């Protein structure tokens, strides 16, 4: 598949072909508590995601939404919507979370963020959910820049450094960002049942880069919405630790996997400039933020503003 996950192959980069098989809805069979190796909770305290072993594969369950089975090598994903749910829920969960987790099992480095093309290079924005990374990256399309990927930035080592690889050509935005950044004729995917975020497909004003681009900068977004615009270099542990927090990892209980991630991130920190980016979360300020980032990519010694 090119833009939409379906019962076909999904491009996962030049070295990996990730297969998603979307099946008909089925009842979610009980998973014994003893089989659950990890769970995350929703804001109301209810289970949001359960991870359990299913033979050599791994089952990821979103209660009342969908089940995903990731193969032992991370190259195949089977998905079953829960009854009375919509396939788009599976698609959005696959794009935003499952795809990156499967790629991590296949040995790839995937960071929780978005990436955009600036000239011939890529810059990546990393943040927690709701931290503004998709909004910031999408806003660059206002100036004619192409998006590379939303939600999960897959990186590949090269002799010259790291490459940011293109992903699925769609992006997800909350309603307030949609009102500011989305053209009326943009193509929107069907609604997902679990979120008010809408998913917009590539095309029109949202042009996606379909080739790997050298990674020039990584910006870790600060979480203070009132902060003044600033760009501060990070190095060593100050860069490594937040990158580790933003790394997708399915097999987090595997010591070899943890060691592999640390090696890859250490190499990334050595070869790629990492910065903390603070800026006021105001749509009116975004043009100045974009210009500061463009100038910083051209001349990292120049102060923002």
Can you annotate each of these PLM segments?
Residues 1-85, 291-305:
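Long, basic/Gly/Ser/Thr-rich N-terminal segments
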């Amino acid at each position: 598949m090119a833009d939409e996950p379906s019962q076909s192959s999904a491009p996962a980069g030049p070295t990996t072909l990730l297969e998603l098989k979307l099946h008909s809805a089925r009842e979610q069979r009980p998973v014994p508590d003893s089989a659950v190796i990890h769970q995350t909770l929703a804001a109301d305290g209810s289970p949001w995601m359960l991870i359990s072993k299913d033979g050599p594969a791994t089952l990821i369950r979103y209660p009342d939404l969908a089940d995903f089975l990731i193969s032992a090598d991370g190259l195949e994903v089977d998905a079953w919507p829960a009854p009375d749910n919509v396939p788009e829920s599976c698609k959005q969960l696959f794009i935003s979370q499952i795809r990156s987790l499967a790629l991590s099992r296949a040995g790839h480095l995937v960071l929780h963020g978005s990436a955009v093309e600036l000239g011939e290079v890529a810059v990546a924005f990393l943040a927690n959910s709701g931290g503004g990374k998709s909004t910031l990256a999408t806003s660059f399309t206002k100036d004619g820049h192409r998006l590379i990927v939303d939600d999960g930035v897959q990186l590949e080592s090269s002799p010259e450094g790291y490459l940011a690889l293109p992903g699925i050509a769609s992006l997800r935005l909350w309603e307030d960002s949609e009102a500011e950044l989305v053209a009326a004729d943009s193509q929107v995917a069907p609604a997902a049942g679990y979120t008010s975020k809408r998913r917009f497909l590539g095309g029109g004003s949202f042009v996606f880069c379909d080739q790997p681009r050298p990674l020039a900068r990584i910006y870790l977004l600060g979480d203070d919405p009132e902060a003044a615009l600033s760009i501060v270099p990070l190095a060593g542990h100050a860069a490594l630790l937040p990158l580790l927090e933003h790394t997708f990892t399915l097999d987090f209980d595997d010591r070899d996997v943890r060691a592999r991630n640390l090696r890859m991130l250490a190499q990334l920190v050595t070869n790629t400039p990492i910065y903390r980016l603070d800026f006021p979360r105001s749509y009116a300020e975004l043009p100045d933020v974009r210009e500061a980032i463009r100038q910083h990519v051209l001349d990292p010694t120049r102060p923002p503003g």
